[in-house]
């Protein structure tokens, strides 16, 4: 795939006219998908696809077009030439772009993460052995994902990474379910087995009589999957330079110095070693960015456009200025001590349907739904009926945060909208002294 991309770059270079500049992005995957129902294979197939994002720049104007690639070198060259000509015709019709900034450095980046992926004849027997008698519904996706970038200034980046993602739910006869996931780059049959057995154990607890709680504040443990939902809300402009400059960030008070989180909280955009490429879709090299350190705001994610508009220094963020590999530093809580340290309170496996109830206060709301359990004296008593929580980040990860787990979970995005995502998060679980349930 890299060779095909290099040929495309050469083709566009050869077709350029005087005064023109270009950037060329490349996305490709070779993925294997398997869908399960009642722990049986119901659908299996492979997807091999590639596309290019061509941007033409001239005289302060820019236009871009996406081109689906066939794998046939001659046909793809023709498609790019057609796209290039259409962009040439479009540019004179556009207004000058006041925030157009191109990285004119001839940087080079190359990353090849070829971790061996499990064979299906290894995954399927394990699944049958551990969950063949259960109502398991889910999807397995695996294979290499590629990203490329090149420009007429000589920049060239290539990223290729193997990964797998098993996302499933175990359904109880009463209609409730346990949702679980196992994903990463280094497959471990033992780790997958442990995750399946943990989900099976939680499924057994769903058969107990439901516990109904009154609205109020309760001690709670948020598992990494639940923390991923909370962290995902912060990615909605929380660290964005544009959102912060215009007053539309949930972390406005934190970055203004008017509030802080617990000293236990340190968030980093950890691109190195992640599934995400070390360059942005805008064509700038990416480095690790400390976002929050010991509860205090540090850097923000700055795209080239925001840098131009607000007179900042770009740091490789893409156009959305959203983290692609968010990492939260671990704490001191051992996994084996979670229930003991929780004592009496809520064990929350997942959160659902999160939204902001008060953006400036970083207050968010959502549902607990399935696999939230009531714990007394370190022992799970039963599932909790669906409840709505409404609480501020400055409480959950601030004044009410008691500890974070020593062990963290690598959570890969399950998004396959158009193509498999390279996004990820690396998160611990969180023990909080108080979580507010409203109804």
Which residue ranges define each predicted feature?
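Active-site bordering "gate/hinge" segments
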Residues: 1-277, 284-287, 293-296, 379, ...
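Dual-mode signal for accessory low-complexity, basic/Gly-rich regions
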Residues: 254-439
